[in-house]
Amino acid sequence: MITNWQYNNHGNLRDSVKKLIKENNYTSIDVGATARYWSYPECKTVVDSYPVPENDVLYFNVNIENINDWTSVFEYVEKNGKFDYSICSHTMEDVFNPLELATILQKISKRGYIAIPSKFNEFTKLFSNQYRGDAHHKQFFDIVDETLMVFPKFNWIETDNRSDLILKNYVANELTLFWEDELPIKVFGDGKPFIGDDSLINAYYNQLLS
């Protein structure tokens, strides 16, 4: 379950996460750490497709998006048990299948910390091209009924007036959550069909603005 979540400014909780790992002597693993390996030295196990420069780290060379590439990690966990703690910071928004990644996190760890750009960040025109959010992000997230909800980045967010309504309630640019045992997650719509585009778009904004 999600034990705590909040909107924060980017990186606010990093020291708290490191302190939590150190004080509890948790075995820990950082998934997708290479771009910003802030969890070192408290966390010395890394999964990513590029190695970290630190030489005292257990590194698994894994394409995070390819489930078949995770074999070495799964074998390690089978032999040594689940990690006490996992970190997945600014990675879930980049992958094509965040539900699969969430399943993997639960398979390899007992609990964890996830940081992702907030919906406010993804609706903000961040760069000179005036597009909303980061172009390489494939989806964004919010917490709905204590569940991590995945919202596809549909093209209509660029022009629909309701996108600016979301920004009127701006809180912070990062969504952070702590989970334990299970990580509840689902995709907006939950596989149910919508009758026409208007139904889909209205439901999308109603959920985000509620």
Per-region residue spans from a language model:
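Conserved SAM-binding loop
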Residues: N24-T124
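S-adenosyl-L-methionine-dependent methyltransferase catalytic module, highlighting the catalytic core
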Residues: L99-S210
